[in-house]
Amino acid sequence: EARNDYLQKRLTQMEDDVRTADALERENKRLRELCNLRDEHADYVFEDAYIVSWDSSSWKNAFTIAKGTGDGLAEGMAVVTEYGQVVGLITEIGSNWATVTTVLDNSLEISACVASSGNTGVVQGAYTYGYPNKLRLNYLPAETILRNNDQVVTTGSSLYPKGLILGYIEDAGMDETGVAKYAIVQPAADFDTLEQVFIV
């Protein structure tokens, strides 16, 4: 009996150790990717933050982080993953908190281009077009050639640095006007597993 108790406690301890090791490995991977991101964008400062809550009334459209003006953050700052994937924008802020509106919200419009061709357009959340959890790249020239998995990146603006990854093209067509093309884009950021973000 005592031996069984000992073995059970030992097994529980080993399971805890494995969970801790897995968490440390994920953190280590995030930090390595952040180092790469900082090397690629040496002219920007990145502040890390953890997500403390998601807006329950939305489709991954907004979340709160536990950092704010007291940490040097400001409304309008871009938010990315450790891989340089665009998550969204700070839209409300307090001294020790901030609300991030994600790219899935169609109120955000981001100047973007198809990396392979350089054709530019505007990305916004595609929920109102019947594509929840997707993006839509609008206002592309009619002659634009689009291929599945073409990368869509930011063109650079006062809000978003150039070359950040928005996502990958899944589908395309002519828009409602019949004079421009659009593309449906799978976001690069995985909103289902997002825990930590970086503010640019």
Predicted regions and their residues:
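A secondary-structure micro-motif
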Residues: 1, 20-23, 30-200
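N-terminal membrane-targeting segments
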Residues: 1-13
